[in-house]
């Protein structure tokens, strides 16, 4: 974070805590139970960086593109929906437009539905929200929350305060790259917009996932001049230790929280007996991007 070291950026603890407090006091689990969402330390770090690091010159948030790569079953859908809820209800942008984007409309349903379940579970949020046929509308702030599918030819009309891109590894080739460009180019009218991209690793090469990985890696190594991208890449360091639970905690920060250790032990044994299952385990639970024939038995 060279901007913090150089003094170009500030960390506003009050703004960071405001976002954390909203999520933990208004956002409920959407599956299995109705408890309030309790953020883990890694999630608090992400929320704090997004909403707490400010451009000292403008006073606005520093980061516009956030890229989170975390293994399957670590609660990323609900986490993304909770961040979107903060943007829709608390961020203070009148007339905000929040989009949940995926290649197909039914794929965008996952985070969109999690968002609406958060709203329904809280009487205060629900009382100022109307579910319409094409969107979720918050009259008090003139805010629209909508799910949309790929249409890279249509760029007019998008004026997003926030875009949530789910499972970026499934965004195919040029189509995914073009759609991402459409949404990023539409950010200009907002003072502090946010594109949140969440994913596990995948099998597709040369798509937007790979492009974001290249940019993110360069940023984290200090080799990039970019100042608006904020990556969080949770993956194992040692592929030879892929079956070690301590190593797996690096790609599964919620190990033992949202999923038990026993689940991973069972999946490891299945992977040891099947090359195809090992490839799937390495990509989806270790976040190592591989071709199908890459790993050795």
What are these regions (language model features)?
Residues 1-294:
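Phosphate/NTP-binding elements of NTP-utilizing enzymes
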């Amino acid at each position: 974070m060279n901007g913090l070291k150089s003094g170009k950026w500030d960390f506003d603890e009050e703004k960071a805590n405001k976002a954390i407090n909203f999520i933990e006091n208004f956002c409920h689990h959407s599956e299995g139970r109705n408890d309030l969402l309790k953020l883990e330390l890694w999630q608090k770090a992400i929320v704090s960086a997004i909403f707490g690091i400010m451009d000292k010159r403008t006073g606005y948030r520093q980061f516009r593109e956030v890229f989170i790569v975390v293994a399957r079953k670590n609660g990323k859908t609900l986490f993304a929906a909770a961040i979107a809820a903060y943007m829709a209800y608390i961020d203070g942008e009148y007339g905000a437009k929040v989009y949940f984007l995926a290649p197909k409309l039914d794929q965008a349903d996952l985070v969109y539905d999690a968002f609406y379940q958060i709203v329904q579970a809280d009487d205060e949020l629900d009382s100022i929200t109307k579910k319409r046929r094409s969107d979720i509308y918050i009259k008090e702030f003139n805010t629209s929350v909508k799910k949309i599918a790929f249409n890279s030819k249509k760029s007019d009309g998008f004026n997003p305060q926030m875009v949530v891109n789910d499972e970026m590894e499934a965004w195919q080739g040029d189509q995914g790259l073009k759609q991402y460009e459409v949404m990023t180019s539409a950010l200009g009218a907002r003072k502090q917009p946010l594109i949140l991209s969440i994913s596990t690793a995948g099998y597709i090469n040369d798509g937007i996932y790979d492009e974001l990985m290249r940019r993110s890696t360069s940023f984290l190594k200090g080799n990039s001049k970019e100042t608006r991208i904020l990556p969080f890449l949770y993956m194992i360091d040692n592929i030879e230790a892929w079956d070690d639970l301590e190593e797996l905690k690096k790609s599964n920060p919620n190990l033992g929280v949202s999923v038990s250790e026993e689940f991973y032990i069972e999946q490891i044994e299945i992977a040891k007996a099947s090359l195809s299952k090992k490839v799937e385990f390495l990509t989806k639970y270790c976040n190592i991007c591989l071709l199908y024939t890459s790993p050795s038995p």
